[in-house]
């Protein structure tokens, strides 16, 4: 999955994005937050994707 596709999926789940440094965003949902690196069209590692989903308390 590409970073841009995952970003769209997160937005569809109701995740709020706040600006961070460079290409990174602070994302939050229901009091849980983490950092999302957005590198556009590059492929995202599966471990990073699963980690962000887990940290936000979302289901795959």
Curated annotation (Swiss-Prot):
Enumerate the Pfam families for this protein.
Answer: HicA_toxin (PF07927)
The record, for Gene3D superfamilies, names: Hypothetical protein
The UniProt entry, under InterPro entries, shows: HicA_mRNA_interferase (IPR012933), HicA_sf (IPR038570)
Where in the chain are disulfide-linked cysteines found? none
Under which EC number(s) is this enzyme classified?
A: 3.1.-.-
Tell me the domain of life: Bacteria
| Main enzyme class | hydrolase
Query: Does the keyword section mention Nuclease?
Result: yes
Q: Which UniProt keywords apply?
A: Endonuclease, Hydrolase, Nuclease, RNA-binding, Stress response, Toxin-antitoxin system
One MF annotation (Gene Ontology) recorded for this entry: endonuclease activity
For whether the record's keyword set contains Isomerase, the answer is no
What family does the database annotate? Belongs to the HicA mRNA interferase family.
Q: How does it assemble?
A: Probably forms a complex with the antitoxin HicB 1 which inhibits the mRNA interferase activity.
Q: What does this protein do?
A: Toxic component of a type II toxin-antitoxin (TA) system. A probable translation-independent mRNA interferase.
* This protein's name: Probable mRNA interferase HicA
The gene name on file is hicA
């Amino acid at each position: 999955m590409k970073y841009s596709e995952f970003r769209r999926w997160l937005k569809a789940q109701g995740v709020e994005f706040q600006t961070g440094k460079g290409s990174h965003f602070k994302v939050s949902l229901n009091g849980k937050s983490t950092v999302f690196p957005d590198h556009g069209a590059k492929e995202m590692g599966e471990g990073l994707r699963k980690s962000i989903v887990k940290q936000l308390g979302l289901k795959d």
